[in-house]
């Protein structure tokens, strides 16, 4: 967890390798068995040309980064807005980076506004977005 919450501070990156097995396990956990995710034969005959990871799997990795930085504050008081740019595919290695853009205080509560991006090993943007985390001012 962050010991100091200040504007411009980078969050610890998360790096994850996407495999078909991870995609299949996520499908089981989420109940989302859309064939674009789990049926390689079906997906090969679509414009995407193969299976892709669930968007929410990618966001789970963003949430992992935010939980590492803000702990329970993220889990209970965090909000996320994301834009999906490209699909993540089996074989991709995703790197999720984030930073604190600004810290605002209202009464005895502080808010950290963060930005994040998720890129694959080719540097292609997969997901980008913003988060807001509410936390007690004494953690600042």
Question: What positions do the PLM features span?
Answer:
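Catalytic strand-loop segment that frames the active site of acyl-thioester-processing enzymes
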Residues: 1-53
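A generic structural signal for short beta-strands and their flanking turns/coil linkers
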Residues: 14, 22, 32, 76-80, ...
């Amino acid at each position: 967890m962050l010991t100091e919450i200040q504007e411009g501070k980078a969050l610890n990156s998360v790096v994850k390798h996407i495999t078909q097995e991870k995609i299949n396990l996520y499908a089981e956990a989420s109940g989302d068995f859309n064939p674009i995710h789990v049926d390689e034969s079906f997906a090969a005959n679509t414009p995407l040309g193969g299976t892709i990871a669930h968007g929410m799997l990618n966001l789970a990795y963003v949430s992992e980064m935010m939980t590492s930085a803000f702990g329970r504050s993220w889990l209970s008081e965090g909000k996320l807005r994301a834009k999906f740019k490209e699909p993540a595919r089996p074989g991709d290695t995703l790197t999720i980076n984030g930073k604190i853009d600004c810290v605002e205080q209202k009464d005895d509560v502080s808010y950290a506004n963060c930005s994040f991006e998720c890129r694959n090993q080719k540097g292609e943007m997969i997901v980008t977005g913003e988060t807001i985390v509410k936390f007690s001012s004494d953690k600042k």
